[in-house]
């Protein structure tokens, strides 16, 4: 989970209010101290922390709750509102207005820029845009091959020449090339060789003059914490069309510091990197981000995940009729497990469900994820006939499947039990109920 330790600490602070018999000044001050401690441990700037928590305390002690809202609920709302304001208030998506729209990405060495370019290309491809990627990184020989390796499986074309040494020429040629390929979006990757902001900005200016991008994106490493302020500020002052992506928020205790530092400059954060996989890039929406961080869920985010799934897994009316007649196969179950895997880590999905927040132990979530992985491995060891007709799987077949998948007989039996329960569940539903469920879960 992104900023897991910060989220838990903030969620625990709010629980003190929710569980208290009554709310007085002493409790408010105690909760404010907890919030201060949590933010400082996430490497948020001291001055920013004090300013934020002073406002939370003032509002919590002075404001009267509106009619129908309890004092506890009002204070939780205040914390949510102030944290959202702290991180930028509203979402600022990248807009594809012209065809082609050109995005130029820059970033210092080690920021995760090249991987982020691939994630960005995949993000827009999933939303129906035709994307072309230009590799103008002449400094790192492996950059072009890295982009090819990441994007070839998704049939996203990469333009580049590992032998060319002129980055500006390469960027210009790449943009001109994709203008003839009828793409909607061109993303230009640059060299990440600069350690200092001024060198980075100079290269950005040179390439910008040649390719005239619609937007310039600075990729910032979330692990640098509040040091991100200087990078973001220098960048914001250098270009009026700049936006920011903060990476590696899944692996850093300093991610809160990086996010708040960038937000403090006023530079718009467009996306955040939340994992290593190519789909682990999220549009940054402060309100939804804070809601998840506080354990309050993100229903909109969950619905968007389901919407993405609709394109990945399609079950027809005939399939639904078949399920209702009890003709649900292991192959159908496999398709559902694949769909769940594509939604992202189980922990990330569970955090989107209101009320669940941080209540499930990590160990339990890990067991759930491991179980889903194991089920897929077991089904990969089955024959087509067994997947289509699970009823033929007798004890000798179970032994063979267990041996072939490197699992135990007990694991195979557990999968078959789970399958039979799902089959029974579908058979017990009427067509309208199942159609509604199918639409919701991308079936």
From Swiss-Prot:
Predominant subcellular localization, coarse grouping: cytoplasm
The keyword GTP-binding appears for this protein: yes
UniProt-listed Enzyme Commission number(s): 3.6.5.4
InterPro entries noted in UniProt: AAA+_ATPase, P-loop_NTPase, Signal_recog_part_SRP54_M_sf, Signal_recog_particl_SRP54_hlx, Signal_recog_particle_SRP54_M, SRP/SRP_N, SRP54, SRP54_GTPase_dom
Keyword Ligase: no
Enzyme class: hydrolase
UniProt-recorded Gene Ontology molecular function terms: 7S RNA binding; ATP hydrolysis activity; GTP binding; GTPase activity
Subcellular location(s) of the protein: Cytoplasm
Pfam families to which the protein is assigned, alphabetical: SRP54, SRP54_N, SRP_SPB
Record's GO cellular component terms: signal recognition particle
Alphabetical UniProt keywords: Cytoplasm, GTP-binding, Hydrolase, Nucleotide-binding, Ribonucleoprotein, RNA-binding, Signal recognition particle
One of the GO biological process terms: SRP-dependent cotranslational protein targeting to membrane
Listed Gene3D superfamilies: P-loop containing nucleotide triphosphate hydrolases (3.40.50.300), Signal recognition particle SRP54, nucleotide-binding domain (1.20.120.140), Signal recognition particle, SRP54 subunit, M-domain (1.10.260.30)
Assembly notes: Part of the signal recognition particle protein translocation system, which is composed of SRP and FtsY. Archaeal SRP consists of a 7S RNA molecule of 300 nucleotides and two protein subunits: SRP54 and SRP19.
Domain remark in the UniProt entry: Composed of three domains: the N-terminal N domain, which is responsible for interactions with the ribosome, the central G domain, which binds GTP, and the C-terminal M domain, which binds the RNA and the signal sequence of the RNC.
Identification of the protein by name: Signal recognition particle 54 kDa protein
Organism phylogeny: Archaea, Methanobacteriati, Methanobacteriota, Thermococci, Thermococcales
Recorded name of the encoding gene: srp54
């Amino acid at each position: 989970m992104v900023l897991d330790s910060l989220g838990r600490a903030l969620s625990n602070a709010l629980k003190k209010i929710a569980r208290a018999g009554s709310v007085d000044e002493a409790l408010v001050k105690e909760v404010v101290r907890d919030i201060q401690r949590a933010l400082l441990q996430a490497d948020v700037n001291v001055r920013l922390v004090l300013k934020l928590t002073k406002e939370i305390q003032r509002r919590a002690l002075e404001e009267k709750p509106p009619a129908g809202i309890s004092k506890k609920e009002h204070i939780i709302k205040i914390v949510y509102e102030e944290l959202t304001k702290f991180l930028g208030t509203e979402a600022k998506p990248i807009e594809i207005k012209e065809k082609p729209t050109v995005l130029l990405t820059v970033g210092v060495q080690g920021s995760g820029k090249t991987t982020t370019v691939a994630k960005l290309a995949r993000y827009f491809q999933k939303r129906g845009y035709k994307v072309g990627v230009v590799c103008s990184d002449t400094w790192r020989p492996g950059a072009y091959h890295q982009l090819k390796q990441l994007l070839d499986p998704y049939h996203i074309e990469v333009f580049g020449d590992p032998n060319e040494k002129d980055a500006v020429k390469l960027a210009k040629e790449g943009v001109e090339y994709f203008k003839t390929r009828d793409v909607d979006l061109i993303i230009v990757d640059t060299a990440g060789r600069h350690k200092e902001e001024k060198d980075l900005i100079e290269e950005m200016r040179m390439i910008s003059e040649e390719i005239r991008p619609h937007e310039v994106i600075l990729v910032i490493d979330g692990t640098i914490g509040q040091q991100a302020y200087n990078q973001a500020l220098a960048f914001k002052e250098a270009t009026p069309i700049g936006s920011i992506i903060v990476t590696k928020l899944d692996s850093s205790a300093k991610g809160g510091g990086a996010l708040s530092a960038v937000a403090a400059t006023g530079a718009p954060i467009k996306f955040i990197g939340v994992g290593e996989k190519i789909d682990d890039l999220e549009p940054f929406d402060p309100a939804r981000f804070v809601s998840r961080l506080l354990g309050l869920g993100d229903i909109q985010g969950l619905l968007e995940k389901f919407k993405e799934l609709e394109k990945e897994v399609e079950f027809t009316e005939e399939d639904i009729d078949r399920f209702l007649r009890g003709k649900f196969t292991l192959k159908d179950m496999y398709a559902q497990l694949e769909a769940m895997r594509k939604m992202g880590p189980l922990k990330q999905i569970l955090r989107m469900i209101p009320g669940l927040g941080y209540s499930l132990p990590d160990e339990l979530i890990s067991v759930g994820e491991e179980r889903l992985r194991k089920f897929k491995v077991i089904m990969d060891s089955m024959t087509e006939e067994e997947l289509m007709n699970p009823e033929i799987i007798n004890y000798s077949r179970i032994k063979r499947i267990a041996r072939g998948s490197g699992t135990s007989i007990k694991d195979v039996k557990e999968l078959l039990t789970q399958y039979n329960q799902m089959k029974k569940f579908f058979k017990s539903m009427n067509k309208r109920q199942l159609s509604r469920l199918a639409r919701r879960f991308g079936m």
